[in-house]
């Protein structure tokens, strides 16, 4: 198997890229030298074809009609049976469409990925099937997952089941909408800047971003290796804990995971007494320029209601919370341009299981369909290219060197408190924008809500969004964040609040005025 050889034009372009001057002699000599070096590429290609290429898998799937997909939340539907019985037997799960399901088409919300069918199941898919779950389909996500709203998918906007003229949130908007609408029992979401917690908050469901590295990212399309997370989106905290118990733990294929990572016990203490736990309300998480006062008030009321069951609730200042967003922004922008775009998703320089078929497919379409990318991805491309080339990646290096300081600021507060609380989002779901909205408004509406969620992607702390109440008839999320690998306490506090609050209504119950009464907010 012969690797494609560069022609003279390609060699000239490579030389210009690196500032290398090619004289007449060099132009004659380099093709043969490069050809010799590419001999190893030929050997690797043949070895991979013989020894490591995954077998082709065929699984039935369907593209649902508009009437079958009123929220535009399904990319394709399936009915993949479990591989064994387990704790999830009889439960239906949707998989975010940046996560590979062998034999089922994948789009990742983007024309640049459209047409790809993976040959491997992601680790989380394998584990869900082994635990008895049925995979009901792939849920629509944002274009390359770089949006906190739900209007950038190439397949069209995902609609909020509470009000179909409003955003469902992103980038896991399809996952949250399907859970909220009762189409599935739970879903897999991904989170690089809040993309599990944002749609969970907008749609009135539970979303948990686990501690970084707790759940293997193997088989999901990356954005930036140091902020990639997968986690559960569910109706209840109990189901989030149950799902986490299935998908957590080291798989040996993900460089994001330390060798010591083990799944915890998230269920045995879930309903334990929370009397005496200390809750810190982070002042810097409130009063953003775009914050709705009613949302801030609802979350403060929800947090203070925990005193009714014995928790101590106090306010705390963490000034680094306001800096952490900017640290995240540099890492996500430069790192996203370097790995997600120039690195065709996976990048290099790390061990782990790669998906070379997906890398090659994306590389073949990334430039061809660049104009079809969302404005948010174009912002990453243009800003990140400047950061990498003109600034030499130094800003990325500075941001990475600041991460330990931001992490330490939260850790200091978490020595005083068991968990930290703030609004997941500064406002309730807004109306979907018009198709001809100007570029600046497009980007602001897509990314303007992530100030509280993004910091914990870069610091890696576990962070849970639970419904705190309703403002103007729309859900509000309260975010509960804890110590690294203490996901159990985060979920325990969320569960205690859930029981105190009472069952959160579904959109259908709210519409029929049969919703249960909520205690706080």
From Swiss-Prot:
The reaction(s) catalysed by this protein are: a monocarboxylic acid amide + H2O = a monocarboxylate + NH4(+)
Pfam family of the protein (one): Amidase
Protein name, per record: Amidase
- NCBIfam families, sorted: PRK07235.1
Q: Keyword set for this entry? A: Hydrolase
What EC number(s) would the UniProt record show? 3.5.1.4
Q: Which family does it belong to?
A: Belongs to the amidase family.
InterPro entries, alphabetically? Amidase (IPR000120), Amidase_CS (IPR020556), Amidase_dom (IPR023631), AS_sf (IPR036928)
Q: Where is this region: Disordered?
A: 155-174
PANTHER family (alphabetical): AMIDASE, TRANSAMIDASE
């Amino acid at each position: 198997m012969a690797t494609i050889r560069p022609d003279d034009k390609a060699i000239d372009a490579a030389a210009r890229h690196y500032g290398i001057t090619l004289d007449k002699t060099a132009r004659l000599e380099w093709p043969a030298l490069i050809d010799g070096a590419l001999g190893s590429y030929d050997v690797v290609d043949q070895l991979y074809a013989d020894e490591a290429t995954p077998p082709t898998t065929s699984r039935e799937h369907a593209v649902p009609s508009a009437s079958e997909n009123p929220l535009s939340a399904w990319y394709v539907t399936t009915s993949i049976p479990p591989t064994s019985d387990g704790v999830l037997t009889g439960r239906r799960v949707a998989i975010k469409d940046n996560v590979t399901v062998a034999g089922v088409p994948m789009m990742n919300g983007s024309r640049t990925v459209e047409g790809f069918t993976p040959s491997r199941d992601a680790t989380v898919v394998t584990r869900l099937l082994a635990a008895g779950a049925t995979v009901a389909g792939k849920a629509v996500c944002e274009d390359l997952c770089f949006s906190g709203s739900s209007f950038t998918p190439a397949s069209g906007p995902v609609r909020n089941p509470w009000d179909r003229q409003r955003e469902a949130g992103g980038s896991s908007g399809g996952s949250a909408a399907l859970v909220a609408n009762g189409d599935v029992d739970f879903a897999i979401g991904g989170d690089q800047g809040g993309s599990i917690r944002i749609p969970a908050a907008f749609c009135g469901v539970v979303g948990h971003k686990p501690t970084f590295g707790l759940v293997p990212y193997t088989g999901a399309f990356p954005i930036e290796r140091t902020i990639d997370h997968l986690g559960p989106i569910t109706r209840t905290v109990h189901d989030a804990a149950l799902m986490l118990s299935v998908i957590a733990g080291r798989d040996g294929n993900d460089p994001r995971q330390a060798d010591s990572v083990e799944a915890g016990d998230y269920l045995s203490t879930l309903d334990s007494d929370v009397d005496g736990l200390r809750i810190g309300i982070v002042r810097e998480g409130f009063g953003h320029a775009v914050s709705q006062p009613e949302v801030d008030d609802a979350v403060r009321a929800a947090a203070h209601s925990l005193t009714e069951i014995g928790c101590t609730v106090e306010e705390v200042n963490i000034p680094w919370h306001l800096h952490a967003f900017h640290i995240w922004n540099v890492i996500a922008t430069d790192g996203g341009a370097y790995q997600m775009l120039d690195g065709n998703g996976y990048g290099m320089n790390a061990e782990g299981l790669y998906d070379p078929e997906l890398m090659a497919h994306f590389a073949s379409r990334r430039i061809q369909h660049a104009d079809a990318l969302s404005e948010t991805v174009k912002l990453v491309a243009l800003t990140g290219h400047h950061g990498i080339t003109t600034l030499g990646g130094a800003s990325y290096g500075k941001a990475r060197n600041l991460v330990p300081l931001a992490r330490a600021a939260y850790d200091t507060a978490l020595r005083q408190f068991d968990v930290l609380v703030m609004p997941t989002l500064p406002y309730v779901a807004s109306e979907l924008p018009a198709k001809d909205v100007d570029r600046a408004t497009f980007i602001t509406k897509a990314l303007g809500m992530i100030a509280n969620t993004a910091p914990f992607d870069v610091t890696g702390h576990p962070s849970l969004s639970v419904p705190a109440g309703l403002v103007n008839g729309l859900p509000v999320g309260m975010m509960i964040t804890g110590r690294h690998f203490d996901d159990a306490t985060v979920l325990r506090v969320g569960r205690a609040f859930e029981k105190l609050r009472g069952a959160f209504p579904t959109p259908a119950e709210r519409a029929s005025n049969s919703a249960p009464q909520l205690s706080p907010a």
